[in-house]
Every structure is written in C-alpha cells, then in structure tokens.
Amino acid sequence: MDDSVSFIAKEASPAQYSHSLHERTHSEKQKRDFTITEKQDEVSGQTAEPRRTDSKSILQRKCKEFFDSFKRQLPPDRNSELESQEKNNLTKSIKSRHLVMISLGTGIGTGLLVGNGQVLGTAGPAGLVLGYGIASIMLYCIIQAAGELGLCYAGLTGNYTRYPSILVDPSLGFAVSVVYTIQWLTVLPLQLVTAAMTVKYWTSVNADIFVAVVFVFVIIINLFGSRGYAEAEFIFNSCKILMVIGFVILAIIINCGGAGDRRYIGAEYWHNPGPFAHGFKGVCTVFCYAAFSYGGIEVLLLSAAEQENPTKSIPNACKKVVYRILLIYMLTTILVCFLVPYNSDELLGSSDSSGSHASPFVIAVASHGVKVVPHFINAVILISVISVANSSLYSGPRLLLSLAEQGVLPKCLAYVDRNGRPLLCFFVSLVFGCIGFVATSDAEEQVFTWLLAISSLSQLFIWMSMSLSHIRFRDAMAKQGRSMNEVGYKAQTGYWGSWLAVLIAIFFLVCQFWVAIAPVNEHGKLNVKVFFQNYLAMPIVLFAYFGHKIYFKSWSFWIPAEKIDLDSHRNIFVSPSLTEIDKVDDNDDLKEYENSESSENPNSSRSRKFFKRMTNFWC
C-alpha cells in the first residue's frame, strides 16, 4: 500500500463505521506512544526505574519533560508505526468540542467588532447589510466545499493552502500560499494594534504596555501547542458568543425604548441620515471588509491534521457555520445599523479627528445612555482581539511549515519539536508581531488600515482557490470514473455552489478594483496611496504566480482532470452503498413499527426518517 494513501474505512455497517474508526485510531495512538517510549529507553541505554513520587522528583521530571519537548521529533525510522505518516507530525490534540467552538467564534474580532464602524460610515446601514448578505452566501458555499476537501485531505500539513497545487495548478497554489501566509503573519500585529486602540476607551496610558501584555499572553498560550490553542479558543469563543447573545437582547430592548434615556428608535436612522451613504460604490466598500470579518472560519480545516477525529468533527463544524452567519454576523450587523447613524463622529474613519473612536457595538449601547454595559462589551471586544491574535500565532507558523515542507522556504524552518510545535516558524511569526509596538505612534489608524489592506483582499484569494480546487476535484473524480462514495463528507451546496462562490469572489475583486481607482472619500479621483490600501494583495499574488511560472518554466494554467492525482495524501472512504443503508434503515424501522404501541400510525416511521434527515442536515 502506498504510504501517502490512507484507507480510513472498510466495508462496514453504517452504525459500526465511525465507532470502529475511532476505536482503531485510539488503539493505534496508544500503541504508537508506547513504542516511542520503548525506543527512547533503547536509545538512552537506561533501564526504566520506578518513578519516585516525592514533590521534588516530580518537579524535576516535569522540568526535564518541558525542556525535552523542544527537541526535534524522533525520526520515523525509530518507529515503524510512524513510517506511513507525514514527515513532521503535528500533535492530535483538538477535540470535537474545540472545533465546534472554533467554527462558531474564531475570527470574531477586528473586522466585525471594530472595522464595521468604518464601512458603516461609507456604505450606510442598508449598504452594510446588503454587502454582508452577499458575502454570507459566498461563505456558506465555500465552507461546504472546503469541508468536503478538508476531510479528504485531513492529514495534509497546510491543508487548504495546498489544494490548488494538487488539484488546479502548482503556481496558483504557491501564490495563494504566499499571500495567505503573509495575511496571517500581519494579522498578529494588526490585533495587537487593535488591542491598544480598544484599551484607550478606558485609559490613556502608554499603549505599548498593553501590546506587550497581550503579546506575552498569546505566546504563553501557544507554547502549549495545539492543545493550549484549542482550550484558549474554547474559552475565548464562549465569552464572545455570550456577549453576542447579550448584545442582541439588549439592542432589541434599547431599540424598543425599554432601556437607556431615549424613546422608541425603530428605523429612525434608516430614514435620517438614510439607508445608503454613497450609493452602490459605498456597498462595494463593504465586500472586502465582510471577507475580512468572516476570515478565520477556515482555521477549522487548517487544524485538521491535529484533530482527534476529523471524520466526525469537520462535518459537524461545517454544518454549524450557518448559525454563525445568521446569528452572529447578520443579526448583530442589522442591530448595530438600527442603533448607530452612519454619520456618527465616534465611528472609526470619521472625519472628526476630535472624536473618541470606538467600536460600533460600544457606540450602539453607550450613545443611548446605558451605563456600565459598554465597559463589559469593550472587555469582550478585547478578549475577541486576543482570540484572533491567538489564532494568528497558531495559523502563521503552520502555514510557514507547509511552505518549508514544499521547499519554498529554507528546510530549517521545517523543524517540529516533540510536542508538535513548528518552533522556528513560531519565532518568525513573533518577529512580525513586533510590528504591533507602533501602537504608540500618531499614525496608529494608518498602520491599522495598511495591515488591514494586506489581510482583507488575501481572504478572497484563498476562498476562491478553495472553490476552484473543489470544482477541479469533482471534475477529476468524474473524469477518472471514481465514485463519490469515496468521499466522507459531501458538500451540501454541491458542484454548482462552488461555481457560485467563484463568481461572487470575482465580482468582489472587480468592485474592490473600482473602489481602489476611484475612492469614495476622494470624490472619484485616483489616489495611489488609497489604491494600494485597497488592492495591496493583488500585486503580491501576481508577482508570486508569474514568478513561480518563470522559475519553473511551467506554462500550463491547470492540471488536466485525467492527470490529477486523486490518491496521494487523500483519505479514501469505502462505505456501504446507499441501497444497503436503506435496507438496514428499513429493517430497523420495520422492527420499531411492529414493536411500537403506535403501530397503527403508518406515517410514524416516515416522520422519524424526515426528522433524522433534518437533524443530519442542520447539525
């Protein structure tokens, strides 16, 4: 059997399928850990001694284990159980509960909680909601496609950044990997700057102090590897989601006149100052900000190589994305638009330099006379910013590791320690994080805008590449006569959903180009500075793409469907046919029907089937 291919499931009944996989994975993990321990004893030449239980010896042992964890992973030839795995193994420490919370809350930070204030001022309330609505349709199609590929290539380091290289074109894969890696490397200082801006709501103390505190905090979290990241995100995202729920309830009460110092508000701000700020061009400014706000949701796939049971966790997380879109993004955005006028001087990007710029969530509550609560909201916004900084320090090193394994970066960066941490890549990310100490500069908001310029457009490129990869994957499966039963999870939006996502992404890029050459606030006149602030990622992508073409002298623009390698790196699922599943379900239903007291109702089994299908679809 080819080492690069993992046959995850054999012929089995539907009920035994996921259970047997989990049992085998758990037993193999135990066996592997035991074998590694034996090998370590053989290499050291020492006989295992009974462990002393006094506190001093325990402390010494813990310290030794901590320092030893930074050593390079044991080479594969010391353990036959590891020979079939990737060269650098990332620790499988992320559980299903972590992944569900990551899919719901990761990425809720700068874009939604802070950056929305700027685009509200340029687009108006109706423009902001319309832009987010279109972006939401695209995102759902993308995540469904990415979930299908994510389960097929769960063990691939770098995950979706390597899909284009395998399924579309190596040059496209290289360009997307480069720009996406740069995005996550710049997101870290962006969040540090945002943290300093958030703290200024309370105090005017030197911002670099807070940058240093947040920086050290996320470093400590990530020193615990993927487990530390996952547990921290579980806590952070729980706080964010609770804040969102609380904000929704409070915002409705305020709008109805039940809190604060004002009467019923209703849709007052949609009439005065109005629904749109700058017409259709204002709506176009929303698209990239919406993409940036939704960014980070794909991290659930990047962590696939470190998940204990991706067969269960990835489909569940992908299905729950719709709740994040509707409840966390769309609903909160609509409520903010009902409580904050787009001409408010307190919004980020306002022309009034004397205003105290704050998050639109804080403005929505504080401007209507509600006391204390804005401080809690601002505190959760700070937690959200720290959460995204934590995600960037998790994602950035793993993307660098993927580039190093592909030979794009020096091989020394492929160093992975015994706890599964890409250590040298981690240090490179820390260097980029130091940019965050410009928070004390007078040009703080300018730095924020430039860092956001790199991040926002990059998100569209990675999403488009994921959809293109899914399209080419389906084309190759059909062309080579492969069955879709080999796929563990099928995208609910199907083949054409990916085409819709690609078309929307292209539309966004065209709109962003229009806004870049004819900015809203420049009265349609070209401004080079504003152009690059809106379109900075495009030159990076083009340079990386054509540079790769020239260097490798590869002039084909895609891999033919019949030549796409569908075996290497892919998990192949062999599940029972649909006919067999139906037979099992029918037999079970028949027994339940005969033994049930309500067997007189012939529609009972049919209703149970319908309920089960609905549950599987939404949950």
UniProtKB/Swiss-Prot annotation:
InterPro entries in the record: AA-permease/SLC12A_dom (IPR004841), Amino_acid_permease_CS (IPR004840), Amino_acid_permease_fungi (IPR004762), APC_YAT (IPR050524)
Residue intervals annotated with topology Cytoplasmic: 1-99, 144-172, 226-233, 303-320, 390-422, 468-499, 551-619
Residue list for modification Phosphoserine: S13, S80, S84
Extracellular side: 121-122, 194-204, 255-281, 342-368, 444-446, 521-529
Membrane-spanning intervals of the chain: 100-120, 123-143, 173-193, 205-225, 234-254, 282-302, 321-341, 369-389, 423-443, 447-467, 500-520, 530-550
This protein's record includes keyword Ubl conjugation: yes
Entry membrane topology: Multi-pass membrane protein
Sites of the Glycyl lysine isopeptide (Lys-Gly) (interchain with G-Cter in ubiquitin) crosslink: K39
GO molecular function: amino acid transmembrane transporter activity; low-affinity tryptophan transmembrane transporter activity
Lipid metabolism is among the record's keywords: no
PANTHER family: AMINO ACID PERMEASE, VALINE_TYROSINE_TRYPTOPHAN AMINO-ACID PERMEASE 1
Family: Belongs to the amino acid-polyamine-organocation (APC) superfamily. YAT (TC 2.A.3.10) family.
Role: High-affinity transport of valine and tyrosine. Low-affinity transport of tryptophan. Can also transport L-cysteine.
Protein name: Valine/tyrosine/tryptophan amino-acid permease 1
UniProt source species: Saccharomyces cerevisiae (strain ATCC 204508 / S288c) (Baker's yeast)
Source organism phylogeny: Eukaryota, Fungi, Dikarya, Ascomycota, Saccharomycotina
Gene: TAT1
